[in-house]
Structures are given as structure tokens and as C-alpha cells.
């Protein structure tokens, strides 16, 4: 495919990892792919995404402010702990604290976070239709088999070329394409929490 027929949409927001934006721009430049950056913070604010999540966070940690970061995680893989999700907060002094959350709180936190995926999908389709392009997904075989994608979010695509490939095979392709090591070694993440979270910390672990 001619790089001129590919458009990469970079969608930062106030809780996303700035490194993701930089790496996205770097790989697009290497592959000679044109990009467009749209900050979706104001859109998410209009849905009350941050307000909904921070309400629960502040109930657990009243001192929470803009200098703190937070995420929902599960016990480390293959530990003896029951896999019950918890809220983890990184305060402005670099100290982490964990808090129990109810099923209702967990569902509300993840539901609000899923809005981020769906806003991203909406923006992708706007630019796809505007340019007569199709939306390409990045779900791999492990994610597809486990259902690790958001319905009408990152699962809302026209084609999914990677669902026949395990992540190990995708790394082989990345090596063949000479993708920078800092991208290859970066933990896969949904990038919906202000406190960095990998797929394994948030959703699943496999041997």
C-alpha cells in the first residue's frame, strides 16, 4: 500500500501517556505515513469521563489532585492472590497506595474508560469516510480469542489483519520491518489510565 494512502490518527488526551504520542509520530515518520493529531480531552470532558472516574477515586483517596495518577489493576500474574481488581493511586510524592473497590465501582470505572475507546473509533471513522479510507484494527489473535477489545471501540473496524497472528508472530514482523526497539519493548497498553498500565496488569496474563 502506498504510504500516501495511509493516515495515522494520533489522539492524545490529558490522561494518556505522552510517550505514546511521541512513539506514534516516530514510527509514522519512519514508515513515511502521514498523520493528523486530534486532542480528544474536551470531547471526553463533555461526556463526563474524568468526572465520573475521579468521583470514585476521591472517595477512596480524598487527597487526590491533578498531580496524582491512578489506574485499575489486578494482582500480578500467577500469584496466589485472587484476581480481584483494585484501584492503585500514585501520589505526588511517588508513593503508591492500593484500595479495594466494589463490583459496581469497577464496572463504572471501566465503563467510563471505554468511552475513550469509542471516541477514538468515532474520530477514526470521521477521517476514514472523509478520505474514502477504511479503518484498520490492531487486535492480535490472543486478544481476539479472549475478547480483549471494546465493542464499538477498538473493536469497531472495517478490517482486522492481525487476528490470525499471535503477538510473538507480530514481534517477528516488527523485527523484519526494523521497528525501533523502544517500540518493540514497550508494554502493550490500552492507555486509558493516567498511571501507566499494561494489558497484563489490567486484563489478562498468559504463560
Language-model segments: residues:
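ATP-dependent adenylation/nucleotidyltransferase module used to activate substrates
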Residues: 1-139
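Mid-to-C-terminal catalytic subdomains of enzymes
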Residues: 137-207
Amino acid at each position: 500500500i502506498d504510504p500516501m494512502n495511509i493516515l495515522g490518527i494520533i489522539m492524545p488526551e490529558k490522561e494518556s501517556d505522552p510517550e505514546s504520542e511521541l512513539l506514534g509520530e516516530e514510527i509514522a515518520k519512519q514508515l513515511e505515513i502521514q498523520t493528523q493529531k486530534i486532542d480528544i480531552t474536551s470531547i471526553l470532558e463533555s461526556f463526563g469521563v474524568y468526572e465520573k472516574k475521579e468521583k470514585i477515586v476521591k472517595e477512596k483517596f480524598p487527597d487526590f489532585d491533578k498531580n496524582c495518577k491512578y489506574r485499575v489493576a489486578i494482582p500480578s500474574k500467577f500469584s496466589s492472590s485472587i484476581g480481584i481488581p483494585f484501584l492503585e493511586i500514585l501520589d505526588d510524592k511517588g508513593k503508591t497506595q492500593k484500595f479495594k473497590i466494589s463490583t459496581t465501582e469497577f464496572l463504572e470505572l471501566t465503563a467510563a474508560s471505554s468511552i475513550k475507546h469509542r471516541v477514538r473509533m468515532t474520530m477514526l471513522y470521521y477521517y476514514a469516510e472523509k478520505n474514502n479510507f477504511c479503518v484498520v484494527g490492531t487486535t492480535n489473535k490472543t486478544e481476539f480469542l479472549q475478547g480483549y477489545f471494546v465493542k464499538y471501540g477498538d473493536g469497531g473496524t472495517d478490517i482486522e489483519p492481525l487476528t490470525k497472528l499471535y503477538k510473538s508472530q507480530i514481534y517477528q514482523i516488527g523485527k523484519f520491518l526494523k521497528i525501533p526497539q523502544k517500540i518493540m519493548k514497550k508494554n502493550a497498553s490500552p492507555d486509558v489510565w493516567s498511571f501507566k498500565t499494561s494489558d497484563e496488569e489490567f486484563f489478562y496474563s498468559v504463560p
